[in-house]
């Protein structure tokens, strides 16, 4: 895993760009609703100031009838704005639900498609449980990031900017007091937030490691029982689980302490602003503001409410930052999977149906009993056809899973059509490795492998593998009917062909004794057989 200490820079930018690619029309509309909702939630202080100012104006004359139209108009405007905010909030929530679930669906599709393009080497060198964690834990953190953290962070940021502008309009002196307190809050946020970010990413890695361990033990449970290895396995799990516990505790310890600290700092700041406003009022100090209004009760009271709202949203920003950091850790892991290099294929020789005409092989569209290698020649544009016979020859082959450590050196052998060749040797001698090389699951370091006289590097991998039959050491069954599993190697095979294959394998009698015969649905890996 790359970047084990922190998420890559640019992960958020890449995620947002991808969301816009998924929903180029809906996402901007949702953003408009979010902005509208945030702006409306920020302006009640303006109406409060105006209403208090009207009350102050008519306090001396007690002419409340004259004040009523103005107050009524302000209240009605506020009601309309709140109704608009309610509609915008509903629209953005509904839209974000569509964007979130749709984006996760497309993200899973991207991940699965990329996984299908990865070479066998990737799955041999990565824990399967950790790979599964991409689809479960990391996708879930991404869901929280898209559906909750980013919208709430955007709303809080817009609210902070709007309230800051209103404060600047009413009183720069009181705003200066607020900014001093907020600066201290930012210092605390940066200190605590940076620590939690580091541990949130480590927590994601530890989750993948734990899931990988559990998956590994589940697959090897029989081996654990046979060797009475339960006690040691429990100790190994406790070690992995303790690591996850430690990383989770560290991450959440920093994250959970932040909000209470900021709330209490906000309460203290509220009292300080109230004292500062009272002292300025009593001293008759001139007000410095963009509005040009003198400092009065109609400004001080709304300013106190704005201070509480301002600090609350600063706290929300800080709180959401932790969620964003955790979500970005999951997104970074997902992008690391999407960025894995796919399996390359430079082959151009393909496998086609063929028939004989005038003693020569020609390509045909109908199914025949003859297969041929179609070999285009770029030099003169000609195409030649070579009958598929199964002649396999290895000449002076060198190979190593690690380029620095060669495990096969100067291997030469051949298998003629119809010839049976057995590889006998100790575990790790290279028996399976040779079959992997013929299938081009791995590429050789030196030498040549020829198939019907053609260098296998020139044959497209899909056609090469389609021409070969492999019986794996471990039985792999997929969820579906018995018939569908037999048909897996030839999707257009008829039921009669599948039954014939089962007879050849000696499985027909066993299959017919199943509850639904060939239509019996089996679970993955045949756990219900």
Regions found by a protein language model. Give the residues of each.
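An intracellular "coupling" helix at the cytosolic face of ABC transporter transmembrane type-1 domains
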Residues: 21-24, 120-121, 139-146, 150, ...
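ABC-type nucleotide-binding domain
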Residues: 64, 354-529
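Helix-loop-helix
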Residues: 58-59, 166-180, 254-332, 337-341, ...
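Alpha-helical segments in transporter systems
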Residues: 25-50, 74, 78, 93-97, ...
